[in-house]
A protein has these predicted regions:
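Aromatic- and glycine-rich peptidoglycan recognition patches
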Residues: 78-95, 108-155
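N-terminal capping segments
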Residues: 1-60, 65-73, 129
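Solvent-exposed, flexible loop/coil residues
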Residues: 24-26, 97, 140
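Surface-exposed loop/turn and secondary-structure junction residues enriched for glycine/proline
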Residues: 23, 60, 79-80, 96
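Residue "hotspots" at secondary-structure boundaries inside conserved domains
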Residues: 55, 96-97
Length: 155
């Protein structure tokens, strides 16, 4: 659908451009001028907590930004409550029903990404803001064990 295509194209706007930042959120339409600015990580629960690093997004913050921007500032999936809340706003589906725009999760909702397409062999590709790469990246589905369809989509 056009809606799904726009979600993926919006996600691709940040590919390779925004650092991973534990607790990083942004409800700014378009580029957030704070991205890349050294800031202290104030959210607890990470080895980076208390350190200063370039501001960016965490995994769920990336999802929030994508849906917020795609909807023109009208929609935040999970209302900013992190990957677990985002998962709660999805209907479980099977992997073979995956479509671009669906959300994928690590066990325990410890990480979230967006299905962005398929490679030439038909394997799912995921766009996500990854701490291991310190950026928005496209990878395969390694580590992702659950998939859900956001209720945002009308089909």
């Amino acid at each position: 659908s056009e809606e799904r295509k726009q979600v993926v194209l919006t996600a691709y706007q940040l590919l390779g451009k925004v650092n991973y930042f534990w607790g990083g959120k942004s409800l700014v339409l378009g580029w957030d001028s704070r991205w890349g600015t050294p800031m202290e990580v104030t959210a607890a629960g990470s080895s980076s907590s208390g350190t200063v690093r370039p501001f960016g997004l965490d995994c769920s913050g990336f999802i929030d930004w994508v849906f917020y921007n795609q909807s023109g500032g009208q929609y935040i999936i999970g209302h900013g409550g992190g990957a677990s809340a985002q998962h709660n706003y999805c209907t479980p589906i099977s992997w073979n029903n995956a479509k671009p725009g669906d959300l994928v999760f690590y066990p325990g909702d410890s990480h979230v990404g967006i299905v962005c397409g398929f490679d030439s062999s038909g394997n799912i590709l995921i766009i996500h803001c990854a701490s291991s790469s310190d950026n928005v990246v496209v990878t395969g589905k390694i580590g992702f064990t659950m998939i859900g369809r956001p209720r945002y989509f009308t089909e």
